[in-house]
Amino acid sequence: MAAKPLLLPLLLLLHLSITLAQNDTNALTLFRLQTDTHGNLAGNWTGSDACTSSWQGVSCSPSSHRVTELSLPSLSLRGPLTSLSSLDQLRLLDLHDNRLNGTVSPLTNCKNLRLVYLAGNDLSGEIPKEISFLKRMIRLDLSDNNIRGVIPREILGFTRVLTIRIQNNELTGRIPDFSQMKSLLELNVSFNELHGNVSDGVVKKFGDLSFSGNEGLCGSDPLPVCTITNDPESSNTDQIVPSNPTSIPHSPVSVREPEIHSHRGIKPGIIAAVIGGCVAVIVLVSFGFAFCCGRLDRNGERSKSGSVETGFVGGGEGKRRSSYGEGGESDATSATDRSRLVFFERRKQFELDDLLKASAEMLGKGSLGTVYKAVLDDGSTTVAVKRLKDANPCPRKEFEQYMEIIGRLKHQNVVKLRAYYYAKEEKLLVYEYLPNGSLHSLLHGNRGPGRIPLDWTTRISLMLGAARGLAKIHDEYSISKIPHGNIKSSNVLLDRNGVALIADFGLSLLLNPVHAIARLGGYRAPEQSEIKRLSQKADVYSFGVLLLEVLTGKAPSIFPSPSRPRSAASVAVEEEEEAVVDLPKWVRSVVKEEWTAEVFDPELLRYKNIEEEMVAMLHIGLACVVPQPEKRPTMAEVVKMVEEIRVEQSPVGEDFDESRNSMSPSLATTDG
């Protein structure tokens, strides 16, 4: 008889558990209805229970049947997070690279959250003070959104957090004292509008790049020196501000070129350049602000790669021409409009004059122009500047439209266009500078003694980052179908943390399609030989070639057809006799002959227990390079496939997600 009183509570608990599980399913169903406008989840999210029906991206607790993980990255989801507020057992939320909007406030009800990845969305509003309720938080990534307001001091209450990424937002106010967060291993607040003092220890721990793009921040070198001034909002308190008055937060979109002034302690060569600049200013005033500081010689010799010049566009001996040309059509804009940088951020970063006087190191030349590393006189600002060739005549209005397309795209795996300068004879694009070079140099550079091989973990992490960047481009322009147009290993760059970013987006729009396709070389899709057109499907093909390049270690040029095994003695004769094929055809032929192991880069074969992952990646690459465009996967599908390839890494505890950092022993950080 004693068992009967116990039966009722057990039944009540069972009923409660079923009810809560059903509530989770209802919440996810509402989330899909509110956000899945493209129907990406409709075919899989069927059945009455999210857990027992194995819904895509949903993981549940085996015991309670409650939802514990929701991972739906890069699915073009658009809408608010409101319906997720009832998922109180949720531990991991990964919705990066979608188009989600609204605020993050609903998540403060999810008290068990540990890992939150919401980068690359359209979230706005403020970071709520109630975020401190998430006591178990380990990684928080809200980067590349439109979040405003101050960083709440309550965030310092996180005791287990390892990572906080809130860069590329619109955050304002005083920066909190992050030195109080002893567990914090990674912090990035760059490119916001924060002000205040950053302690020496914090700068050393997280690096100065984690605070760049905030003109109001000050502290130890390379940040501006802090000075104490009277707070304009309160006469009773002092305010710490940078000693440089131009560093006080403000938000102009574009800045006019100031008068050139002298600097104490400048070298004689720079003094001469400044004097020349003053003469140029007089010419500008007289002739409608035609270019300030001279130009590099277009027809004569240019500085070799790696040389350093005093002045970014100064010192050339080539013919100088008026911005109005010789009897040609003049620009419709006023002279003053031609003398300014146009920024895509809400605050001024530097003046055109600063850029023109910066020391410049040529990084390389391409079909569109020359790329320089420019270090401004303040010593703390380094950017990459591309000078477009004159072979790209583009009306101002059309050029500005292209720049708007490129500049409005924000994503952690796409190189950010910070500003541009337009004049009829001079076009400059200013990008963030990435110090670790390109994937091409890592794969093919220094193949001799002393080379540090690029390990498998790094390769798959870099390809996943590149795939996410390209998927974001395709999703952002899914209606207009704007492609990248030039996917290749030299356009996959690495930042200081070893994260891959896609470069050169949109610049193919400035070229004639025939010329744009010609520069693709071995990355060109087969249909582009007949139909001279750039497309997103052709991008997928190029990405597939890139995958094969990473797997084989071979550049996408021509290779002997492996019609039979070749001995060392017969190599020379056979190379003359055998037909040559491109990289995808070469890989297919080797696989067809069942010599799959010969496909892979010998540097990879020394690693154990990765054969399945390499073969899986090979299948993804081959799926991307099928000759028929309509049979190729979308980049969103490619991202999913790459994410499913598991790489053995060194976890640090139950909730440590090492895959969010691409850095590996084969990738050393440099300042380039």
Swiss-Prot record:
Sequence ranges of Polar residues compositional bias: 233-249, 661-672
Ubl conjugation in keyword set: yes
Any matching Pfam family: Pkinase
Cross-link Glycyl lysine isopeptide (Lys-Gly) (interchain with G-Cter in ubiquitin) per UniProt, renumbered positions: 111
Disruption phenotype: No visible phenotype under normal growth conditions, but under short day conditions inflorescence stems of mutant plants show dramatic reduction of secondary cell wall formation in xylem fibers, leading to the inability of the stems to support an upright growth.
Cellular component aspect of the GO annotation: plasma membrane
GO molecular function term, any single one: ATP binding
GO biological process, one term: plant-type secondary cell wall biogenesis
Expressing tissues: Expressed in the vascular strands of cotyledons, the shoot apex, hypocotyls, roots, leaves, stems and flowers.
PROSITE patterns: PROTEIN_KINASE_DOM (PS50011)
Topological domains, Extracellular: 22-269
InterPro entries cross-referenced by the UniProt entry: Kinase-like_dom_sf, Leu-rich_rpt, LRR_dom_sf, LRR_N_plant-typ, PRK1-6/SRF4-like, Prot_kinase_dom
Domain of life from the UniProt record: Eukaryota
Keywords for the protein's UniProt record, in alphabetical order: ATP-binding, Cell membrane, Glycoprotein, Isopeptide bond, Leucine-rich repeat, Membrane, Nucleotide-binding, Receptor, Repeat, Signal, Transmembrane, Transmembrane helix, Ubl conjugation
Record's subcellular location: Cell membrane
All residue ranges annotated as the Protein kinase domain in the record: 357-645
Binding site for ATP: 363-371, 386
Membrane-side (Cytoplasmic) residue stretches: 291-672
Sugar-bearing residue positions: 23, 44, 101, 188, 197
Disulfide bonds: none
Similarity field: Belongs to the protein kinase superfamily. Ser/Thr protein kinase family.
Swiss-Prot/TrEMBL domain comment: The protein kinase domain is predicted to be catalytically inactive.
Its biological purpose: Leucine-rich repeat receptor-like protein kinase involved in secondary cell wall formation in xylem fibers. May play a role in a regulatory network which also incorporates the TDR/PXY signaling pathway and regulates the maturation of interfascicular fiber cells. May promote the initiation of secondary cell wall deposition during the procedure of cell expansion.
Name of the featured protein: Leucine-rich repeat receptor-like protein kinase PXC1
Organism of derivation: Arabidopsis thaliana (Mouse-ear cress)
